[in-house]
Amino acid sequence: VTLLFAHAYLACPPLRQDPLLATVFSLLVVFGVCCWIYASFLQRFVFKGQRMVVTGVRSLASKTVEITMEPSDDKPLHKGRPGQYVALSAPGVVNGPHPFTEVSAPGRDVMQVAIKVSGIDTRVLREKVGVGMEVKVRGPYGDLDLRRATPRQVWIAAGIGITPFVAWLRAIDELINEKIRRSGVSSSKIRKVASQEVIDQLGLDTVDMWFFHHGEPAYAEELYYWEDRFSWLEVHIRDTTESERQSAAEIIAETPGLDIDHLDGVSAVICGPKTMMRRYSRDLRSLGVHPIIREDFSFR
């Protein structure tokens, strides 16, 4: 963009002759150059975060790994809500911090994030990440809170956008386990009671999870595991290398128990590429689905 502004300034004499336009374009070019210098060279020194060390690397798919990290000092681990993400920087490996969703269950003294190759920096990080690597983590950020949804929910994820939902499912299981531990008794009956208490606490009734991947079924086995474990969850996984992603209307039509003409009380939670989220948000809203919750990776 900076080069385009510079080219327009040099190639268009009227811009140089008009004092106001010349000043505006000059400031834009200088601002762009400063942003590039900061992102390419200075950000790695300015970026502040908790120092951590990689203690585990697990391959999820050909382009996706899950890394486990622990604090490299005595400072307590900064844990966020399920579904939030952190900004991770690997000095000497990538130029600056990148957002990755935290997928570790609450109550653990480790942090886990999933990394999928989506550009040069993530490719380098995917190839070089290993046990013992030092990283910096800042955050958590984000406001993807499923508690804002209605009891009848439709979850839609694409690609690495599955990670916030994995985090929530792990968190729900940990909440159930915590109630069982507090009871002092472990049995299938106690687990059923604890599960119902957690579901009532979260305001959940029925959830249909739609996961679209492009030949990268990261966490697919785990999703089926949660489907078997949670009676309120039904999982639908589609490979977009074999067929196109369903439209919003098709998702509603193929979701058991939903009537496209009567969607009162149905909410949707969406995470994935921005264009996908915008399209599904628009189309689901036009069908009467409300509220629609999505993660826009906002730093708040």
Where do the PLM segments sit?
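A phosphate-binding catalytic loop at a beta-strand-loop-alpha-helix junction
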Residues: 154-168
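Short, conserved phosphate/pyrophosphate- and ester-handling motifs at nucleotide-, phospho-/glycolipid
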Residues: 83, 161, 273
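Transmembrane alpha-helices and immediately adjacent membrane-cytoplasm interface residues
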Residues: 8-10, 20-44
